[in-house]
Amino acid sequence: GDDVLVGGKGDDYLEGGAGDDTYIYNPGDGADTILDGGGSDTIKFGAGISKDDIVVRRAGDDIRISFKNSETDSILLRYNASNASYFIENFLFDNGETMGMQDILDLSLIGTDSDDVIYGYNADDTLRGGKGNDTLNGGEGNDILYGGDGDDKLYGGNGNDTLYGSEGNDALYGSDGNDILEGGSGNDYLEGGSHNDTYIFGRVDGADTIYDNHGNDTIKFKEGIGKENITFQRVANDLVLKYGENDTVRINNQFGGSSIEQIALASGEYITASKINKIIEDLNAYASNNGMSNISMDDMKNNPDIMQMFTSGWGN
């Protein structure tokens, strides 16, 4: 039948069964669990709860609704993250506002001002961390992840994902698929994972580090960065690119088998890993022939012969 279920105070379990059921939830009702697999079902929130008060997160196969003004109140919707037959279809608020399950699922992908942990679904999702030090997990599908402010961790998961670290010292992991990673400002760590990944860098992006040992990978520099702005330096097995006063990209183990295969500019010019290797060899020979050692990046910039080496290997 069409039942009305009121758990009241305490941590309750409510199961409406078949029919169009209504669940009543008021502030202070505790941590309740709802399981409902039939009909068109509704949660009605009492006075004091509006759309702006709720926080939604995925919890495995479930959806958890919590409340910004309470540390103890919550509603766990069993299987609502994985099986549409268990969906609660309608959410009604005392002030007349309404939401559907898709609204709830969308809200679960948006962070708060706190440190959030957000999980995507088996679809093409967009996750937004907002403020705080957030952790975003895209899961399946071709996802877009925005870290926002704070020191965030972004995991693309399966699919061709796009990861934006934005502000802060972020860590971006593409995992499977042909991913695009852009750390943004701050000193970021970027790891594309398997397949063919692209790393995007622009002015004032800070001191970033890349590790990638799979696929055919590319670094792309944004508008305003030309070949004359970029210097190369080998440090042990790493390759360090300097392209601004405080802007660098360190490619871990570039000369030990974990290489970036190509560096490209917005102009369409590019240089391959083999050409970079040749430049490094020529630079070492030049330094030896001229009695130079421990050449700094600034020394390179001020030496026209060295800069000619750096710019000569680029093609269109």
Task: Provide a role label for each language-model segment.
Residues 1-62, 71-87, 115-119, 124-238, ...:
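Acidic, glycine-rich calcium-binding repeat modules characteristic of RTX/beta-roll
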Residues 66-108, 242-316:
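Low-complexity acidic/polar repeat-biased segments
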